Regions:
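N-terminal secretion-targeting helices of virulence/extracellular proteins
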Residues: 1-86
């Protein structure tokens, strides 16, 4: 009977690559939040903009910022896990 050797599902390098991808995604989400807030500011001076547009865009910007923070937290956890060699 042949048994496979125990192996780690992800190498340390793979974890660090994933952590970097998460960090990069967090930066993108921060940029999207910035753009959404800029749009909110622009619409504030536009009388033709529907009333619902600014609050909706503000909520989306906040969601992007929250997601960015969560991705950063996940990236840091992966980095710590890789550094610990677990």
């Amino acid at each position: 009977m042949v048994t496979e050797p125990a192996h780690v599902t992800s190498s340390e390098a793979e974890l660090l690559d994933r952590a970097e991808a998460l960090r990069s995604d967090a930066e993108l989400l921060e940029e999207y939040a910035r753009r959404l807030r800029a749009t909110v500011d622009t619409l504030a001076g536009c009388p033709a903009a529907p009333e619902w547009s600014r609050p909706t865009l503000e909520r989306q910007a906040a969601a992007c910022a929250t997601a960015a923070e969560q991705l950063r937290t996940a990236a840091e956890a992966l980095r710590a896990h890789a550094a610990a060699g677990d």
